[in-house]
Amino acid sequence: MGSQPQNFNHPYSPYDIQLQFMRALYTCLEEGKVAVFESPTGTGKSLSLICGSMTWLREHKRKALQDTVNKASCSAGDDDGEPEWMLEFAKRESARAVTEKRRALEARLEKIKVEEEKQRHAHATDHPGEARKRQRLDTSSGDPGQEQDDQFILDDYDSDAEERITYSKKLGDISGLSTSTLELLERFKEQFSASAEDETGHEDDDVKIFYCSRTHSQLSQFSSELRRVKMPSSMPAELSTSDANTDDAEERVKHLTLGSRKNLCINPKVMSLGNATAINERCLELQQPGVAAEKRCPYLPSKEDEGQVLQFRDHTLATIKDIEDMGKLGKRMGICPYYASRSVLKHSEIVTLPYPLLLQRSARDALDLSIKNHVVIIDEAHNLMDAICNIHSVTITLSQLQTALSQLTTYARKHKARLKGKNRSYIAQIIRLISSIADHLRSTIGENLPAEGAVDPSDLMAGKGVDQINPYKLSRYLQESKLARKVDGYVEFSKDKNQQSDDKPSSPVLFLVQSFLLPLMNPSAEGRFFYLKFHDDIQLKYMLLDPTNHFREIVEDARAVILAGGTMSPMSDYRNHLFSYIAPSRLDTFSYGHVIPPENLIAHTLVNGVLGSEFDFTYDSRDSEKMILDLGRTVAMLCQAIPDGVVAFFPSYDYLSRILAIWRKPLVGEKGQTILSLIERKKSILYEGRDMGAKTEDLLQEYTRTIDSGQGALLLSVVGGKLSEGINFSDKLGRGVLIIGLPFPNIRSAVWQAKIQYVEQKTYNSSSGSEKDRLSIAKAAGKDFYENACMRAVNQCIGRAIRHRNDYAAIVMIDRRYEKANIQGKLPAWIKQSMLRRSVRRPASALAADLSNFFSGRSSG
C-alpha cells in the first residue's frame, strides 16, 4: 500500500490517538478487512471515522478515475500503434469529459446551496412546515360509507404456480404497490440512472460508505460533524483541465440520510396513525390496484415528476442534511422523501442510516439497498449482537392472538361467498394454527408452571388438523396474499362504518401474528421460543439466539466492515461468535487509550467496607444486611471525598429497592439516624426508578440543578437502565462513578439458559480433541460469553464519565470479583492502564484518602 495522508484532512490538529485510529482505519479499508475499533467517548471518534474513511474514499476514487482514463487512452492506442500525441489527446479528452461533468454538478449544487441559504432567512418567520400544494387532491380515507367492499377481497391465489416473479421481487420487498407504481419506480430507477450518469459520470459500482448507528439522534450528531469536514477532490491533479482561476479541488461531500416511512412520511393523514406498522401498511394501501386516483397519496413521485425528483436529488446532495432536513425538503417540494431519496442513493458518497434499515434484509430490499463491494461502518456497536437478535425476534400475547382470531373469523364469515378455493383453504389453516397456539397458551396459564420457560414449537402446532398444514406453502401464502392488509383494512373500515373509531390509531394485530407465524413454520437452528406469564395475560416470544448468519451476508457482501464504539470490550465475542467464520488474517481489533492525561483518572477496585465487610454481591451473599449497611457507610465516606456529582450503578432495580429499604432503617444506637441520612450530610440523593420514561429528563435536570447549587448529589442508577447508556455525565456531573457488584444476567432464566446452552453446543460441535477436552472447551466458551455480557454492561457505565480531554473523574468498582484477572481483562484498555498504576489493594479509608488527594487543588467545572 502507498503512503498515507499526513493528517487525513482533519479540521483540527488531531491527537496522536486520533492519528493512530485514522491510519489503522485507512489500512483496513484499503485491505478490505473486518475490524473492531474501541475509542473512548471524548476522543473524537466520529471525526476520526469521517476523516479516515472519507480520505480513503477520495483517494480510492482518484485512483479508479486515473485507471479509467489510462484504459481509455490504451484503447485508443490499440489501433495500429497510434502516435504518442494521439494517445495523449485521447487521455486529455477523456479527462476533460469527466471534469466537465463533475464541474457542472458542483456548480448546480453550489447554486442550490446559495438558494437554500436565502430561503432559510426568507422563511424564518414564514410557514416552513407547510407542504407545497400539489396539483392532486389531498389523500384521505374518504367517507367510509362510500368505500366499496370489493377492496377487501383477496385476489385469486395459486400456491402451485412454478414461477411468481413480480416487480416487487425485482425492486425488493415492497409488495402491495400497484403494478403501475412498481413499473413507475423501475422506470424511474432506469431513467435516473441514465440521466444522472450523463450528468455526473458516476458509475454503478462507485464505492460508498454506509454509516450506521442506533438512533436518528446519533446520526444527526454525525451529520453535524460531517459538516465540519472538507475533503480534497477525487480528480487527479494531472488530469485537471481547468485554468488557474478554477478550483477543481472543490468537491463537496455527497451525503444521504435514509429513514423509514415513519421518519420521512409527509402525508398528514398517514403520519397521524403513529404506529410504524400502520404507517407502512397505509402507505402501501394507498398505492394498491383499484384505489381511485384521487385517493392515492399525492406525494408519491409520478412519471411527470421526474424533473422534480432530480431536483430533490440535487437539493439533497447540495448540503449535509439530517433526517429532519430531509422531511422538510420533501414538504417544501411536495414530494415523498422516502421514495424520492432512492434517486439520491446512487450518487452519494456516504449514506447514514439507523440499525434496522441496514441489519434487516427485508428493509434493505425495500430500499433497493445493495452493499455489495461498499464499506460498512457501524458506530455505537457495543450492542450490535443484541440489536441483530432483537430485530429478528418477535413477541406476541394471548390477547393479541385472540383479537387476531376474532378479526380473521369475522372477515372469513363476511366474505365466505366470495372467497375462492385456495384463499378459503389457507384462511381456514391460519385460523386452526392461531387457535392451536392460543389453546397452548391458555393451558400454560392454567398449569402450575414457572413464570417463564421454554416452549417446544411442536406443542404450539399440536392442535386439531394443524399437522396437515404445509408450512412452506402457508408461509408463502402469508407473504404473498396480502391477507393481513386486507383483514386489517376491513377491520378499520367496519369500525368507521359503525362509528366505533376513536382518535387513537389501532395497531394492525394480524401483521404481528403473521410475523410470529413465519419463524414458527420455518424454525431456525439459531432461534428458540419462550413464554412469560404476567398479570392476566401470557407472552410468547421467538428469540434469535445467534446473530452470526444474519450479519454474515453483510460481511460477505461488503468490501470492508468496521465496528466502532466507545466501549467495545470485551472483544472475544466478536472473534469467537459474530466473526467466527472469518480468517484471522482478515479480522483486526484495536483498543485505544484516552485523550486525557493519566493523572486525570483514578480507577480502583474496593473489596472491603469501612467496617471490614467483604463486598460479595453474588446471588448467594448479596442480601447480607451487614454488608449492605457497610456499603452505605462506605458510599457516604466516598461521597465526602468526591466533589460535586457521583453516579452509583446497581445490578438491578429490584436490588436497588432492597438496598434502599435497608438504608432507610434507623441504625442501632445512632438516635434514629439512617444510612440515607448519613449520606445526605454529604450529598443530596436522587434515584432512577423503573419505567421512568420521559421523567428521566426531569431527573437529570434536578440532578444538574442540585450540583450547580453547590450541594453535590448522589444519583442511584441501574445497569442497563436509561442512565447507563447514552447519557453524558461530563465534568462535575460525573466526578465519581461507583459500580456496585457485577450485573450478571439471571442465569436461572429460561432465555439465558438457552443462550449458554446454544453457545456451548456450537463450540462443542466446532472443536476437536477428546470428548473431555471438547466438553471443557464448550463450558469455558459458555462461561466467557456469560461474563462478557456482564462486563459489556459494566463498561458502558464506566464510559458515562470522562467526556473530553480536560475532564477528570474517579471510578470505583465495588466487589471482590473485580480483583480477578479474568474480570479485569475484560475492562477497556484505558481503565486497565489506570488500575495498573494503583495495583495494590487499598482499604476503604486509604482509598478515600487517595480520592481526596486526587481531587484536592483541582478546579471544578
From Swiss-Prot:
Enzymatic class: isomerase
Co-factor remark: Binds 1 [4Fe-4S] cluster.
Residues reported in the UniProt entry to bind ATP: S39, P40, T41, G42, T43, G44, K45, S46
Record's keyword terms, sorted: ATP-binding, Cell cycle, DNA-binding, Helicase, Hydrolase, Iron, Iron-sulfur, Isomerase, Metal-binding, Nucleotide-binding, Nucleus
Principal subcellular localization: nucleus
Enzyme Commission identifier(s): 5.6.2.3
Record's keyword annotation contains Cell membrane: no
Subcellular location: Nucleus
Example GO BP: mitotic G1 DNA damage checkpoint signaling
Record field: transmembrane: none
Region (Disordered): 114-153
Record: residues binding [4Fe-4S] cluster: C265, C283, C297, C336
Sequence motif: DEAH box, positions: 379-382
GO cellular component terms, A-Z: chromatin; nucleus
InterPro entries: ATP-dep_Helicase_C, DinG/Rad3-like, DNA/RNA_helicase_DEAH_CS, Helic_SF1/SF2_ATP-bd_DinG/Rad3, Helicase-like_DEXD_c2, P-loop_NTPase, RAD3-like_helicase_DEAD, Rad3/Chl1-like
Taxonomic superkingdom: Eukaryota
Cofactor requirement: [4Fe-4S] cluster
Reaction(s) this enzyme catalyzes, per UniProt: Couples ATP hydrolysis with the unwinding of duplex DNA at the replication fork by translocating in the 5'-3' direction. This creates two antiparallel DNA single strands (ssDNA). The leading ssDNA polymer is the template for DNA polymerase III holoenzyme which synthesizes a continuous strand; ATP + H2O = ADP + phosphate + H(+)
Comp. bias regions, Basic and acidic residues: 114-132
Family membership: Belongs to the DEAD box helicase family. DEAH subfamily. DDX11/CHL1 sub-subfamily.
Name of the protein: ATP-dependent DNA helicase chl1
Organism encoding this protein: Neosartorya fischeri (strain ATCC 1020 / DSM 3700 / CBS 544.65 / FGSC A1164 / JCM 1740 / NRRL 181 / WB 181)
Recorded name of the encoding gene: chl1
